Amino acid sequence: MEEALLDPTNPYAATKAAAEFIVKGYQHSYNLPVIITRSNNVYGPHQYPEKVIPKFINLVERGRPMTIHGSGQNLRSFLYVKDIAEAFDLILHKAKPFDLINIKANCEVTVHQVAETIWRLMKKEGNVEDHIQYVRDREFNDFRYAIDGTKLEKMGWEAKTSFEDGMKATGLLGIIGLCVVEWYQSHPHHWDNIESALDAHPTLPNVQVNPMVL
């Protein structure tokens, strides 16, 4: 629930909580009509490849293994960009100043399922497991990010796009004409240099591990 006490479990989560408190501080000090939103992971065309979906697509396109932190069983919820754009539009028109609103995805998948889906949609041959490299898990990597979306649902919004449909969807707002996978395949040089973004641990050495002993 939106009103639940914030209890960050790691430094990254603490920065998210701190950002909210800074905004609330300005809100109370200057009576700014602030609305705070919290959402699940957003994905779609044009997303920078440091995020898991474009990262995996770009790695496969380059003939490199998809690097999975830990066992790959961590759960993540994904929101297609069109859905969250519609949520923002509704919030701007219907929410009240000082509201705090969760934007909840309608699906939850493991990171391993993300890799499987991308491999299948890219129509690659062979066993996907042969093209996955398990690396040491991130420090303080939460197993799951779950939020309650009841408040926004009562306002008339819910995510319409399943993860599978979002990966097949025809680009940003249906205008580009390419599904998520096809967009990255068609724009390999959209960014000058993404090699550092494709590293499993940009600041740590890649250490291959056996997922069965994690």
Task: Please give the residue ranges for each predicted region.
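Catalytic helix-loop patch of NAD(P)-dependent Rossmann-fold dehydrogenases
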Residues: 1-36, 43, 47-49
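A short, flexible beta-alpha/helix-coil linker loop
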Residues: 41-42, 74
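C-terminal substrate-binding subdomain of Rossmann-fold SDR/epimerase-dehydratase oxidoreductases
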Residues: 60-214
